[in-house]
Amino acid sequence: MDDLEQAILLASDSPAAAAASPAVRAEALAYCARARDETPPSSLLHLCLYGLASSPHAHVHFWCLQTIHDALLLRRRLALPDDLALLRSSLLSLAVSSNAASPPFLRNKLAQLLALLVRFEYPHVYPSYFLDLIPPSPPLPGPTDMFARVLVSLDDDLLSQDYPRNAEEASDAGRVKDAMRAQCVPQIARHWHEAAVSLRAADPAVAAVALDAARRCISWIDVSLVANDVFVPLLFDIALSPGSVAPLAAAAVGCLSAVAAKRMDARAKVALLRSLMSAQKGFGSPDSGLKMAHLVTAYAVEALECYRKLGSSDADGAAALEMLEEVLPAVFAAAESGDDDEVDSGSVLEFLSGYVSTMKAPTEKQLGHLGQILEVVRMQMSYDPVYRGHLDVLDKIGKEEEDLMAEQRKDLIALFRSICRVAPGATQLFIRGLLVTALSSAEVSVEDVEVALTLFYRLGEIVGEEEIRTGAGLIRELVPMLLSARFSCHTHRLVALVYLDTISRYIKFMQENDQYVPHLLTVFLDERGIHHQNAHVSCHAGYLLMRAIRLLKAKLVPYLDTILQSLQDALVQFTATDWANKDIKFSSSEDGSQIFEAVGLLIGIEEVSPDKQVQCLTALLNPLCQQIESLVMDAKAQGLEESSPRAIGLQQIIVALTMISKGFNERLVMGSRPTLGVMFKKTLDVVLQVLISFPNVKPLRSKIISFLHRMVEILGISVLPCIPIALRQLLVDNEAKDMSEFLYLINQIICKFKSSANALLEDVFPAIASHLSVILSHDAFSNGFASNTEEMRELQELEKRFYAFLLHIATHDLSTVLLTPSCRHYLENIMQLLLITSCSHKEISHRKTCVQTFVNLIKDWCSSSEIEDKLPGFRVFMIEKFATGCCLQSVLDKSFNFRDGISIALFGEIMMAQKVMYERFGENFVVNFVTKLREAHCPPDLAEQYYQKLQGNDIKAFKSFYESLVMKIRQQQNGSLVFR
């Protein structure tokens, strides 16, 4: 044992181990492991018991107890009865003689081992465990502490229902509880009371452990053993006494809470709650809430549940509601205390939500309670002032706090909404009080203003648009109050952002009440909005102004000059800022460019006179175009790097031009106000010079593509002559992402201009096909990258847009382009790609697109007479390859899922393809397809029925029949046909 003892000390965190080398410690660990694993069970037990009796070292005692515990847990079936009896008597002797001064980790391990023996042996092998362990009266600290730890370990490892248990554990737990209830629970309860009385002053820590053990057992013992005239007053006295140390007071509160939460019939629960209420004068007072937060919350939850079950018409139900309302002041005090250690805010919030949900038409008393609940919501939604600076600059700490608060507020907002629905008037009065307080004090905090505005914003989510528009309730008073508000802390980012959002939430009120439009514009244009010192606030204000202009439109025409004058410096700053050196990161939807969209929308309002539009647009476009020309000239002389200030400056200007154009449409620009069209056409020419000069600067090219999208939309057919030169430049040095953007533009042009784009498409198609044959080669997918890489995602997106490109060609009278001499060279590869994809691509949506493309090509290229076909051989290809591979074999494959929505849509397109092939190809298609059906083991009668259904006009019946035919063939083949 001496060698083992030395090894244990070296392997532990003892002083001897600290002085040992790593090699020596490793050797000691290995020695201990061999002793534990290779010693026979009986010998190991005797060795450990000897160590417990003879060694003076706590680390050795712990190793021995842990080793016995593990061996017993793993080999208990092999343990001899005599060994177990020896172990039992030794451990009970240690427990009974336990000294409270011994290390807690050692007492916990001894308790855990005794709890395991209880599980295995009580009561059938040894029925006296608890009778032996219950300390005699008067209880001493050592044995009392040890007994409590045994009960706690037993609860943790077996009895508690807070943890998942397997069937064997559940059976053992039931057996132990039943035996304890029959044998010793009353004696144990008396011991808890005696320990609390005698040790609360002498050794409060041990008294607290004893009461914690009691709390754990209350859920399954006879509650009257604790809920009586002797024990309950004692617990209240301990909980509320100024002389009670915090752990002891908390343990007493825990016991009372467990009593309140005890499961029982609702009427019995009402009687129990009544007894608790009567046992302590002032139980529902705010002071009780501060000192017994867990208890008053549990009490309120149980009273509410009784009220729900019994109803207000029942005497006990009414009594439950009365007791609930009596304890509410204590609940509110607990909730408002902000003490996270004492108050479970989740439980309080759940109770308050349940309480509000019981209200239909609140009484005056209940309205008062709702006001207090709103105050709880306000307090719990408020930020901690310690994070004020972090939230203003939004550093890492501030971002984490903002995210945490957003999550924390979800349930609070749900509760706020419930109150709004039950008592809208009271809610509006509450918010009015918050706003008045915030506006009347120069010392009001950032946190108080932010939460007041947030609640007003959330109110706007709940009330209907009609109520906002008409200013129902107090909205007619609150919105003007808000419009004129200038809070002392308005410079703070949080306050400024929520202020602007709240103004925007109620903008329908300004739409109906024109007199407030100037106030609204002032908010957006002064230092509260676009001219705020914080760049994030300024950009957000620009975005919200753009939305306001979209809504108010003609109402803003009288203020056009005022708005443009106020925005002049912001417009200049956007294109002049050195964004390359800015650390600020903006979301793509709020990067500051929205002020250009706002101005474009404003100028583009039809109520603005033509001359005024020309004047304003000239003042906007000319300086931007001049900036572009100057930057291009400098860049040609000195070069243009992708991340250089010049390149980024050009990007910003082109973004600004794109955003301005969003305020205009083709009808206005090319119809009623053609002068505007000329101006945008000149701007396009300037932008194209950038593309011609620097086609390889990818970020710049991406911004130019976005601008081209807008020009296609507003200039209409007149833009076509400018497009070829742009497209040729956009095909320079392309990768997957670049080609994807390019195809998106081409697809827009095809959909917009249809057959008018014939010549353009004929010109660029060979280059497109050539580029894509390389980028979308088989090697790119099979040998390139893992399927989850960014490169692979870009390839997949390009593939999707290419199939859409072919479909747009086929559906917009442009399929003859594919038959021209310059494009025909690529036709065979395209047909094979469409065939393979339609039959077997893993993306069902791609297969559907390809089938639709084939259907449209059949309609375009084939007639009922083969002589008139535009592409010789296409008919045979469709009958022999497509019809067989896609319409039959691909759906016979067991991977084709008839329960999947996208697959069902594909199946519908396949059925349509068969109808079109029959319409254009006639008997040639039918004969070949029926032959293939028979080769696939289709019964002859079903093949004949197929022909009949194909000839009919009911496509739904045809589809249903063909699905059943496919399933029957699958069954006959037993899934043997797998098409790839």
From Swiss-Prot:
InterPro entries: ARM-like, ARM-type_fold, Exportin-1/Importin-b-like, Exportin-T_C, XPOT. GO terms for biological process: flower development; meristem initiation; tRNA processing; tRNA re-export from nucleus. The keyword rRNA-binding does not apply. GO terms for cellular component: cytoplasm; nuclear matrix; nuclear pore. Pfam families: Exportin-T (PF19282), Xpo1 (PF08389). The keyword Iron does not apply. Disruption phenotype: Reduced size in non-mature plants, delayed panicle heading, reduced seed number and low seed fertility. It is found in: Nucleus; Cytoplasm. Expressed in roots, stems, leaves, flowers and embryos. Keywords: Cytoplasm, Nucleus, Receptor, RNA-binding, Transport, tRNA processing, tRNA-binding. Belongs to the exportin family. Probable tRNA nucleus export receptor which regulates tRNA processing and facilitates tRNA translocation across the nuclear pore complex. Is required for correct leaf initiation at different developmental stages and may play a role in floral patterning. This is Exportin-T. It comes from Oryza sativa subsp. japonica (Rice).
